[in-house]
Amino acid sequence: VLKDGSAAAIYGTRGTNGVILVTTKRGSAGKMSVTYNGYMSISSIANQLEVMDRDQFLANGGNDRGYDTNWMDEITRTPFSHSHNLALTGGTTDFNYRASVSYRNNQGIALKSGFNEMIARFSANQNLFDKKIQIAYDATYRRFDREGENSSYDDYSAFKHAYYYNPTAPVYDETGTIDAGGYYALDIQGYSNPVAYIMQRDRRTKGGLFQGSARVTWNILEGLRAQAFGSLKYSDINKGTYTSREVFNTSSFGSASRSFNTRFNKTLETTIDYVKSFGEHHLVVLGGYTYE
């Protein structure tokens, strides 16, 4: 933890309230070991907002479309999720490492929603010249895929339609008289068939990250230490939306959009510090330079 003048000197206004330096899991000396952990789970909605059923709807003057539909049940499911992590560690006192790969797949409670990602990490520590020089290496690679992103365009809107849509309307247009891809999709008081709303629209976000860094520590003299840290970070985000041409009351051509963004960051930090105790006094001197 860096605070007071030392944080501001190196990190500028970003370090006004202090800086916390985080170290992730690292390797240790010893024989190579392999570990695995994972889990599987299912989820459910603990509580649902109470809405009128068919009988209550009709008793309050609603139009009877001939069916008894629970729209919340139609647009939700019991999702299955699982996660896996495999790690490899080993090395000697002069060089040790840790490598891991993890995968996570979470189904969403709403239809056509979910998230999955893969993360690979590598870290290593190296000691040179009887630990006068220490080097720490880190690298991370991540890819993710999100479907049905929670926003006003997707899940939340579908839930809102499910709360207000006619509970006597059918899910599907069995007569085929409505040109809406087989769904019953007549607007009722400004709301649409929630199932059609989800199934005839797609929203997907894919992206990734690569980050690599190295930290070199030089123990010059007792109490005097110099450090240099450099990192590269690249990320990309690819977003796409699609609306079927069969969506009721929309353009016969449908619609689609796509956006792609990338970011590249470089960081260089150098510090030198001196720590010395004089009887009851303790002296700490720190100087540094940061480029980003």
Predicted ranges, named:
Residues Y11-T16, S113-N116, S151:
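Short, glycine-/polar-rich solvent-exposed loops and beta-turns at beta-strand/coil boundaries
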Residues V1-T35, S81-S83, S102-R104:
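A beta-strand signature from Gram-negative outer-membrane beta-barrel systems
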